[in-house]
């Protein structure tokens, strides 16, 4: 798995010693120390997502782009990885552009949520998430969390009705 994390650095011509050190640091950051020599088939879905995050962070991007990274995972793994991403953000302070269709995930992770309209997609509203950091999944039960998710649903519902058809949501 460590070679997977190193791959982007190798393509850029980064020397092997530097690649290995940086990759090892990122593997530790995402909590996969001890799994460096495992093959993809030996890793869970959540571990594979953490490898992808480590690989992206190893390249030291200014902005980390994440498009539905937890979409194919079960709810428990999503919550765990959401907590891990919050921890990683606290350590790195990297700007992360995170695309999700999950309102709870958006409020948990974001500083700002950009709500997009259905076709044609435009920014319909930007909602500032004013929940203090550091955060963890315990905020899911807070009153402010419920207020923000409700506010987002109020903006999203008309868009969902357009995209899915009003009858689908009334059923």
State the predicted function of each range.
Residues 6, 10-13, 17-35, 87:
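Conserved ABC ATPase "signature" region
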Residues 53:
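Hydrophobic anchor residue at the start of the ABC signature
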Residues 116-148:
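Conserved beta-strand-loop-alpha-helix hinge in the C-terminal portion
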Residues 64-67:
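Catalytic Walker B motif of ABC-type/P-loop ATPase nucleotide-binding domains
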Residues 38-41, 59:
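Conserved signature/switch motifs of ABC ATPase nucleotide-binding domains
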Residues 94-99:
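Conserved H-loop
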């Amino acid at each position: 798995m460590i070679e997977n994390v190193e791959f982007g650095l190798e393509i850029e011509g980064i020397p092997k010693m530097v690649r290995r050190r940086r990759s090892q640091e990122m593997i530790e950051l995402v909590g996969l120390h001890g799994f460096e020599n495992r093959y993809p088939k030996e890793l869970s879905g959540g571990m594979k997502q953490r490898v992808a995050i480590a690989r992206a962070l190893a390249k030291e991007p200014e902005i980390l782009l994440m498009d539905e990274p937890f979409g194919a995972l079960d709810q428990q793994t999503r919550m765990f990885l959401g907590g891990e991403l919050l921890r990683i953000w606290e350590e790195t302070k990297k700007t992360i552009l995170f695309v999700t269709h999950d309102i709870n995930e958006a409020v948990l992770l974001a500083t700002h949520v950009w709500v997009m309209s259905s076709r044609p997609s435009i920014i319909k509203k930007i909602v500032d998430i004013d929940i203090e950091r550091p955060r963890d999944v315990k905020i899911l039960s807070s009153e402010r969390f419920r207020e923000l998710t409700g506010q987002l649903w109020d903006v999203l519902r008309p868009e969902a009705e357009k995209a899915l058809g009003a009858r689908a949501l009334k059923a």
